[in-house]
């Protein structure tokens, strides 16, 4: 039976669509999950969404929808992003799932019956965006110490969790084990929250209704942290019959989360488990933030980075690599478009991409793609072979400890050494004399072996591109197995290479920065009470120039070169026309066929991804979604819209 490994991301709060900051934790966990699977572990990788709370309730009310309708749309975008970024999660939990609700109600009741939860009155400060209560002494300049926003007075009946009874136990747990990483976080928790006096935690609310009801006191809903944290065990079947592998996977091998919620995962969560007499998780890694141009990302600041844009322009693996490469262990990192593009060019296009393309091209040019089996070694080979042979042992603990940036450094040291080895051995000079063929074959074989080892260790980080590398260098699945990565000389002596595409094309940084700034510029929302002059007034004569007509969509298909464009055939009662529209992210072709629409009939033809477009559909920008204006099915095609 294989050893098990259970790791989790935090469950994300779907108050808005995901951005690059959400991607760091998820890609970091996905990398570890893939690496442990390479090692032969039975992995359970959990992610999901934390969907209750006052903030969600308020945002849903603003949009005129129910909280469940509000989160459903955003959760779908999270899942779409994880699919785009090749996240190999095993389970996705939503706190609105029935089985999770059942577990939370049982846990709350059990803790109440054991005397760990009691009823009282909460008086203090509350931050709605963070869903956090604070004492006056914890505020920074009178504002929330986590997000810096205004707090409000709260005074309501509530249930409390007796954290104070476990102050000594939790301090001992944090200081005498290696649970919380990096170690600097331990001092933060002990000095800021435990030593000043660990306070009991408010765990229910009566001032809003969007939450899990306390089944023995219906006017209360379970407050965020008992609800959210319990996902790590409800997803395994604890307290419900949905799953039955709690005994198999618990305790968790690693929880990973951003530093702002380390307090709840390092203090509240272990205490809840102690109260339930359950084993404690083995490790918690609290990573830093990705800042954009030196400032923490925030939708309210308009500085979030859209990962869909980056993945479409530069490839998923380049984005996965970059966001892990520049995050120092336990510290914040600064994300800028220029840094990202420079990193892609330097590491992926120049170092890795050139190493693969040059090596494969030389094997193809000098030996027709298949190396001869004769070999002549030289002292020049020893350092490269030694570095490649020991790389797996060096990188393994780094990946297991979420030190992904350091793991990348070690791998690219070997890649850089291999590029230097090409210059030292000068294969193009050896190729001029047939008597050097055995030596030339040795040099190329050493390069192919180095690429095999490096690409296999990079595959958890870049799972889509590395199989292409293996195909080019003639490596089979057995050649890149984990148990072969500490051995040099695994490829067949007469290995055959196969030239392929350029894996990471070089980027024109200056022009790309301009384009990214345009694509990621925050949309300006014109409020109803703004002066219309600001939006631009047109005359009736100008408006009369626009010819609007009705039509029926008779056929629709995706354009292969784009993730955003659909090619639409419209019956306009005048012979038909083709319209290309950027709505593929919001509608499938099947949803549109047969729909009656309004289109601009006298728009000049335009070429989009090689397809001619003769018109434009009418649609409205509905917040996070674009909605096409559909007409009644009985509307005649070709009618003029007045």
Report residues per predicted region.
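Secondary-structure transition/capping motifs at alpha-helix termini
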Residues: 1-2, 35-42, 63, 67, ...
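Structured secondary-structure scaffolds
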Residues: 1-47, 99-103, 153-365, 409-411
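N-terminal catalytic cores of NTP/NDP-binding nucleotidyl/phosphoryl-transfer enzymes
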Residues: 2-74, 93-108, 113, 130, ...
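A glycine-rich helix N-cap at a beta->alpha junction
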Residues: 76-88
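Cys/His-rich short segments
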Residues: 114-167, 171
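Helix-rich, typically C-terminal accessory recognition domains appended to large enzymatic cores
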Residues: 119, 326, 331, 339-376, ...
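Intrinsic disorder at enzyme termini
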Residues: 469, 473-542
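Phosphate-backbone binding interfaces of nucleic-acid-interacting proteins
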Residues: 524-642
């Amino acid at each position: 039976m294989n050893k098990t490994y259970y790791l989790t991301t935090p469950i994300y709060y779907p108050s808005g669509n995901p951005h690059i900051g959400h991607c760091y934790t998820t890609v970091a966990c996905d990398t570890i999950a893939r690496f442990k699977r390479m090692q032969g572990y039975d992995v359970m990788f959990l992610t999901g969404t934390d969907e209750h709370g006052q903030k969600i309730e308020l945002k849903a009310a603003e949009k005129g929808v129910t909280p469940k309708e509000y989160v459903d749309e955003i959760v779908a975008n999270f899942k779409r992003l994880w699919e785009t970024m090749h996240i190999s999660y095993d389970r996705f939990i939503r706190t609105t799932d029935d089985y999770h609700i059942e577990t939370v109600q049982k846990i709350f009741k059990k803790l109440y019956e054991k005397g760990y939860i009691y009823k009282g009155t909460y008086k203090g400060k509350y931050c709605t965006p963070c869903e956090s209560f604070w004492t006056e002494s914890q505020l920074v300049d009178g504002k929330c110490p986590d997000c810096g926003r205004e707090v409000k007075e709260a005074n309501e009946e509530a249930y409390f969790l007796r954290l104070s009874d476990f102050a000594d136990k939790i301090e001992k747990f944090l200081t005498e084990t290696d649970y919380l990483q990096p170690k600097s976080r331990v001092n933060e928790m002990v000095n800021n929250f435990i030593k000043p006096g660990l306070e009991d935690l408010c765990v229910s609310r009566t001032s809003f209704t969007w939450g899990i009801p306390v089944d023995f006191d219906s006017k209360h809903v379970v407050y965020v942290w008992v609800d959210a944290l319990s996902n790590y065990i409800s997803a395994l079947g604890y307290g419900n019959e949905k799953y039955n592998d709690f005994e198999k996977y618990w305790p968790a091998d690693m929880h990973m989360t951003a530093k702002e919620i380390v307090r709840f995962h390092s203090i509240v969560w272990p205490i809840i488990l102690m109260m339930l007499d359950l084993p404690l998780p083995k490790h918690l890694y609290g990573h830093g933030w990705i800042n954009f141009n030196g400032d923490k990302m925030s939708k309210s600041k308009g500085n979030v980075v859209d990962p869909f844009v980056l993945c479409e322009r530069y490839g998923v693996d380049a984005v996965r690599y970059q966001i892990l490469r520049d995050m120092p262990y336990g510290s914040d990192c600064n994300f800028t478009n220029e840094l990202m593009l420079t990193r892609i060019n330097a590491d992926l296009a120049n170092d890795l991409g050139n190493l693969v393309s040059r090596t494969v091209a030389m094997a193809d040019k000098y030996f027709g793609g298949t190396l001869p089996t004769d070999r002549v070694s030289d002292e020049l080979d020893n350092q490269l072979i030694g570095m490649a042979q020991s790389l797996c042992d060096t990188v393994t603990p780094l990946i297991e400890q979420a030190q992904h940036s350091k793991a990348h450094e070690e791998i690219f040291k070997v890649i850089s050494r291999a590029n230097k080895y090409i210059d030292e051995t000068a294969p193009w000079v050896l190729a001029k004399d047939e008597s050097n063929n055995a030596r030339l074959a040795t040099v190329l074989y050493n390069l192919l072996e180095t690429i095999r080892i490096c690409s296999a260790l990079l595959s958890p980080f870049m799972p889509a591109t590395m199989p292409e590398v293996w195909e080019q260098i003639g490596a089979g699945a057995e050649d890149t197995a984990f148990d072969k990565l500490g051995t040099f000389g695994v490829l067949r002596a007469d290995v055959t290479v196969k030239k392929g595409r350029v894996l990471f094309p070089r980027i024109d940084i200056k022009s790309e920065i301009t384009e990214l700034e345009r694509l990621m510029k925050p949309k300006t929302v014109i409020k109803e009470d703004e002066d219309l002059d600001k939006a631009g007034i047109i005359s009736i004569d100008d408006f009369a120039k626009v010819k609007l007509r009705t039509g029926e969509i008779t056929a629709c298909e995706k354009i292969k070169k784009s993730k955003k464009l659909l090619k639409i055939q419209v019956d306009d009662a005048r012979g038909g026309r083709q319209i290309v529209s950027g709505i593929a992210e919001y509608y499938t072709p099947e949803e549109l066929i047969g729909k009656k629409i309004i289109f601009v009939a006298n728009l000049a033809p335009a070429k989009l991804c090689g397809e001619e477009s003769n018109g434009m559909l009418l649609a409205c920008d509905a917040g996070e979604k674009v909605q096409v204006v559909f007409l009644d099915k009985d509307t005649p095609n070709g009618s003029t819209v007045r």
